[in-house]
Amino acid sequence: MLETCALGLDTSNYTTSAALLQNGKMTSCGKLLPVKPGEIGLRQSDAVFHHTRQLPQVMAQLGGAVRHVRAIGVSDRPRDAEDSYMPCFLVGIGAAEMLGQALGVPVHRFSHQQGHIAAALYSAQRLDCLERPFLAFHLSGGTTEAVLAAPDHTGKVFTTQLAARSLDLKAGQVIDRVGVLLGLPFPAGRHLDPLACACGEKIRARASMKGADCSLSGVENKCRALVESGAPKETVAATCMAYVIAAIDAMCAALREQYGALPVLFSGGVSSNSMLRAQMTEKYGAVFAEPRFSADNAAGPAVLAALREEGFGCAS
């Protein structure tokens, strides 16, 4: 059990998140950024504005226990790469640094992707995976990637190396765009899932691949054509998910052939989808987080901060 009391902050698109890890238990709070009906996202300037307004509200939900924090973890960029940057993370970074100075505790920075992976492992009670290499899929509106994760002994807890990705649209983008076509709220994943499950047809889908990388740009056009032809919403939703899942399945198969039968982890909001979870668990024995730890959250940075403070991944 993690003993360190740690605070996690994450201000990504499209959720303001805070989490408190105390006595091994996680309290996680979050608030979606407001997106107008019919729109499929926010400009970064708007995201920064809404995070600035919402973060104090989200922090208030954690109550006075924050004063017992001994470390803070914060998401500072989308991915663990030098060219990875997004202005919305500056809101969380600024809050973390101010709190760290006020409380006299260390602030540890991690990528948003590392946070997703850590939250999924924590939720599935599989932090032991950090002791050896594994494949981690991060599926969201901004990312559709598989990375090779490996233990790190320089204080980072673990490192990630890009192994496969979408060459164009991301899985979450496709789902959100098709959802908006169907008149669903944004983000659309949680609303598209039950529609797809209600479809009585068996949809045959073939993935468009280049090596282990996938292409998802054609899925939106297929679904748009179905909508224009008057197809039931359930059929459109099921078609969307069938093609997305076929692509992820093909990526996983190619990577297992390349790297061997490594453990496979799924994180990110798209990983909440029930059809994806069922297929990947049955076929690959994949590890999934609880849905609330799949979507954007700050549990991952809190877990990683605690691991850092407890010496995990540090050279002895």
Give the location of each predicted region.
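Conserved phosphate-binding catalytic cores of ATP/NTP-utilizing and phosphoryl-transfer enzymes
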Residues: 1-2, 105-135, 303-307
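A short helix-loop
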Residues: 2-4, 11-12, 27-29, 128-132, ...
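Short glycine-rich, Thr/Ser-proximal phosphate-binding strand/loop in the N-terminal lobe
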Residues: 6-49, 155-162, 288
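Short, well-ordered amphipathic alpha-helical segments that serve as non-catalytic structural scaffolds
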Residues: 32, 50-65, 247-252
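Short beta-strand-loop/turn "lid" adjacent to the catalytic site in phosphate-handling enzymes
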Residues: 60-97, 101
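Glycine-rich beta-strand-to-loop/alpha-helix junction loops that act as flexible
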Residues: 74-77, 140, 265-273
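Glycine-rich phosphate-binding/hydrolytic loop that grips phosphoryl groups
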Residues: 116-120, 289-316
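A contiguous, well-structured pocket-lining segment that forms one wall/lid of small-molecule binding clefts
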Residues: 190, 194-263, 270-281, 285-288, ...
